[in-house]
Amino acid sequence: MSSVVVVGSQWGDEGKGKITDFLSQNAEVIARYQGGDNAGHTIAFDGKTYKLRLIPSGIFYSDKISVIGNGVVLNPKSLVTELKYLHDNGVSTDNLRISNRAHVILPYHIVLDGLQEAAKKDNKIGTTNKGIGPAYMDKAARVGIRVADLLEKDTFEEKLRTNLEEKNRLFEKMYGHEPLKFEDIFEEYYEYGQELKDYVTDTSVILNDALDSGKRVLFEGAQGVMLDIDQGTYPFVTSSNPVAGGVTIGSGVGPAKIDKVVGACKAYTSRVGDGPFPTELHDEIGDHIREVGHEYGTVTKRPRRIGWFDSVVMRHSKRVSGLTNLCLNCVDVLTGLDEIKICTAYELNGEKIYHYPASLKELSACKPVYETLPGWKEDITNCKTLEDLPENARNYIHRIQDLVGVKVSTFSVGPDREQTNVLDNVWAHI
């Protein structure tokens, strides 16, 4: 039995898809455990780039099982579209498994998401308007519709009718929005369920059976630790738990079966949407990193906010998610800069602090304390080992490792699978 969890250790978009794809080569089962189609992941290999939102990165390996766990909120329309996208590109989805306990995103969730965000005016949290939050709200309120319900026509009809009556009253009285039609949603989404039914099963059984039989299982998170609803920059967070602890709830696998937690991070920091960002750059360097790193949202296409590497954030991620290894991505993006800064602490009310405050008021008053390192000019996109890197690039990686207190197991010097370089095999010591 061996398992590895890949989490984003910043604010998402850290290259989890690439690292998951890379680690999938030695896994037999790959599983998503939370989130929805609000976050995309990009995988590049053999000269082609694929962008997915719901289906795990392991789908590109025909000999591996890919699982969408019960902690995911699933938009059937998006999933059917994604399946067609893969089929059109010659990718088989025969090994996909979908949890019958996953909750379903329906049109009223998406409408409500947009209405709630618009009503906040200057206090927007930067939702992607994919219905994620409202779907998790229904789940917590025990009125959600699960995949198992979607497949049972009478059950789906009854629950949809009840929920839609309530949502339509809310739309009309609270927001002045026209009601949604039951017939339009019911027929369309029941049909989606029929298209998906052959993939649906109890994925907790599949995952536990795999682990108990000695297979390697890789768990893939969405978003990042700093967007976790409990441990992130609340309320500027997602509605689920991307931290490694979310695996046990979102997949039905007990905590004793988790062996390693790999934190994916960039050699700098990025963020999409509103919320605190202590090391954010508002200058030409930030613009340069954004363009060189193609820092635009996979799903939203919004330009990402850019900042220096923040070791305070990373130590927080290490603590709350139990990071055992780091995968450092996008080192090549920093090539050409004369100097590179790393945030080592914050200054708050004249004192240095080394933890990430919960209070938004305190966060807004924090000033990053920087350490400046010399940059490098050499092209590193073909480097395969640490020794191949320029001395300044090596020193930068070592300094990140020292400040975070977690060993760097891989570093990447480009978007392709072949540009990911292994320093320590995560699977080897389990």
UniProtKB/Swiss-Prot annotation:
**The name this protein goes by in its record:** Adenylosuccinate synthetase
Q: How does it assemble?
A: Homodimer.
According to its UniProt entry, the function of this protein is described as: Plays an important role in the de novo pathway of purine nucleotide biosynthesis. Catalyzes the first committed step in the biosynthesis of AMP from IMP.
Family membership noted in the UniProt record: Belongs to the adenylosuccinate synthetase family.
Q: Which residues bind GTP?
A: 12-18, 40-42, 304, 330-332, 412-414
Cofactor(s) of this protein: Mg(2+)
Residues the record lists as binding Mg(2+): 13, 40
Instruction: Reply yes or no: does the keyword Ligase apply.
Output: yes
Q: Which residues bind substrate?
A: 298-304
Catalysed reaction equations from the record: IMP + L-aspartate + GTP = N(6)-(1,2-dicarboxyethyl)-AMP + GDP + phosphate + 2 H(+)
**InterPro entries for this protein:** Adenylosuccin_syn_GTP-bd, Adenylosuccin_syn_Lys_AS, Adenylosuccinate_synth_dom1, Adenylosuccinate_synth_dom2, Adenylosuccinate_synth_dom3, Adenylosuccinate_synthetase, P-loop_NTPase
User: Which GO molecular function, any one, fits this protein according to its record?
Assistant: magnesium ion binding
Q: Which GO terms describe its biological process?
A: 'de novo' AMP biosynthetic process; IMP metabolic process
- PANTHER family in the record, alphabetically? ADENYLOSUCCINATE SYNTHETASE
Report the enzyme's class at the first EC level.
ligase
Q: Where is the active site?
A: 13 (proton acceptor), 41 (proton donor)
Q: Which residues form a coiled coil?
A: none
Q: How is the cofactor bound?
A: Binds 1 Mg(2+) ion per subunit.
* Source species of the chain: Ligilactobacillus salivarius (strain UCC118)
Organism superkingdom: Bacteria
Q: Which residues bind IMP?
A: 13-16, 38-41, 128, 142, 223, 238, 302
